[in-house]
A protein has these predicted regions:
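The feature encodes the CheY-like receiver
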Residues: 14, 56-57, 88, 106
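Conserved Asp/Asn-Gly motif in the active-site loop of CheY-like receiver
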Residues: 31-35, 92
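Two-component/phosphorelay signaling modules centered on CheY-like receiver
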Residues: 11-29
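Active-site beta3 strand of CheY-like receiver
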Residues: 45-50
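Receiver (REC) domain active-site loop signature in two-component systems and cognate sites
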Residues: 55, 95
Length: 110
């Protein structure tokens, strides 16, 4: 079983993306912001993180920094893909330089 942490503050995104992934056989846990996510990421092993960037409390960039600086080697090395409405090329470059594995711009299709 592949475990995915999906982090987004938009309920519609959480519902539609998690449903699509679960239909394909993935186990998905959802979090509404980075603050919630870091607690979950520190207590359970995930194979992949899908993070929005623009969120309240702790945004995706800050969450990525915390994950990449974690003392937990598995967490620190977890692949992370940004799913974001930030569509400027510079945003993508910054995200990848910060340590994101990939960058997908919203809206996206299955």
């Amino acid at each position: 079983m592949t475990y995915i942490a999906l982090v987004d503050d938009e309920p519609n995104i959480l519902t539609s993306v998690s449903l699509a992934l679960e239909t394909e056989g993935f186990q998905v846990d959802t979090f509404n912001n980075g603050e919630e996510a870091i607690k979950g990421l520190e207590t359970k092993k995930y194979d992949l993180g899908l993070f929005d960037i623009k969120m309240p409390k702790m945004d995706g960039n800050e969450l990525l920094k915390k994950v990449r600086s974690s003392t937990n080697v598995e967490l620190r090395n977890m692949p992370i893909i940004f799913l974001t409405s930030k569509d400027q090329e510079q945003d993508e470059i910054i995200g990848l330089r910060m340590g994101a594995s990939d960058y997908i711009k919203k809206p996206f299709s299955q």
